[in-house]
């Protein structure tokens, strides 16, 4: 089976003085979360579409779904975790407790605040996860990347045509993800900022799927302005 996990755990600290977490902020007259969710509802492959959100925002999430007449029976709202990867594993535990997990089950995880993903990106994630077990959505790095350990001087300048910028979805064979996460130490888990690194840290390959430049993550006031411009310009019509 195929599952979607929408990560709505952010509290929007980088968005500044706003009354709601960023996933509930208005974008073209409806919350960012609703834009994102609508993309997944259009994909019939999913057995469940699971939204993971902080406990204190679960009721608000359900109220928002009702307000915007989102009634797809596949949608479930659960409590997120203490961080990104803990939230993903909470979704996995929920799937296991309600449906069980088969060897070929996959999960497509996606940031709630990336509302411009496309049908193509979702379908290619599903297919790549079924074929390869783990997949990351990326775009080519446009700018030269430099690394610095002291925040003062350059340590290295990697070859740009080998660099990519990570997006979401990130998709996995569920058993592979569970087994890989269980192999990590508590220290490794504490510094993870990316789900695909769970797989990389256990020396397993992660397939790349090409994203889109406009598949942005809305985390700052500037991002919100860009997102509104994308909608007004009709850039992301897929």
UniProtKB/Swiss-Prot annotation:
Residues carrying the site annotation Transition state stabilizer: 14, 22
PROSITE patterns xrefs: ISPD (PS01295)
Top EC class of this enzyme: transferase
Site (Positions ribitol 5-phosphate for the nucleophilic attack): 160, 217
EC numbers on record: 2.7.7.40
Residues bound to CTP: 7-10, 81-87
GO molecular function: 2-C-methyl-D-erythritol 4-phosphate cytidylyltransferase activity; D-ribitol-5-phosphate cytidylyltransferase activity
Pathway membership: Cell wall biogenesis; poly(ribitol phosphate) teichoic acid biosynthesis
Record GO biological process: cell wall organization; isoprenoid biosynthetic process; poly(ribitol phosphate) teichoic acid biosynthetic process
Stated role: Catalyzes the transfer of the cytidylyl group of CTP to D-ribitol 5-phosphate.
NCBIfam families, per database record: PRK00155.1-3, PRK13385.1
Name of protein: Ribitol-5-phosphate cytidylyltransferase 1
Organism: Staphylococcus aureus (strain bovine RF122 / ET3-1)
Originating gene: tarI1
């Amino acid at each position: 089976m195929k599952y979607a996990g929408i990560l709505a755990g952010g509290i929007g600290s980088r968005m500044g003085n706003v009354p709601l977490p960023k996933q509930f902020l208005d974008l073209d007259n409806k919350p960012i979360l609703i834009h994102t969710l609508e993309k997944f509802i259009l994909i019939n492959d999913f057995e469940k579409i699971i939204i993971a959100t902080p406990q204190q925002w679960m009721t608000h999430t359900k109220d928002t779904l009702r307000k915007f007449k989102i009634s797809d029976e596949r949608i479930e709202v659960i409590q997120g975790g203490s961080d990104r990867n803990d939230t993903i594993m909470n979704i996995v535990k929920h799937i296991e407790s309600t449906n069980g997990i088969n060897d070929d089950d996959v999960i497509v995880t996606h940031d709630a605040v990336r509302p411009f993903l496309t049908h193509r990106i979702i379908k290619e994630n599903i297919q790549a996860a079924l074929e390869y077990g783990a997949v990351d959505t990326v775009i080519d790095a446009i700018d030269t990347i430099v690394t610095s350990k002291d925040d003062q001087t350059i340590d290295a300048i990697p070859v740009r045509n080998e660099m990519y910028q990570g997006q979401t979805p990130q998709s996995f064979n569920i058993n592979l993800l569970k087994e890989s996460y269980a192999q990590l130490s508590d220290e490794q888990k504490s510094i993870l900022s990316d789900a695909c690194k769970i797989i990389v840290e256990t020396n397993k390959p992660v397939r790349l799927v090409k994203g889109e430049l406009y598949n942005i993550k809305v985390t700052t006031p500037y991002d919100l302005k860009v997102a509104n411009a994308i909608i007004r310009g009709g850039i992301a019509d897929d």
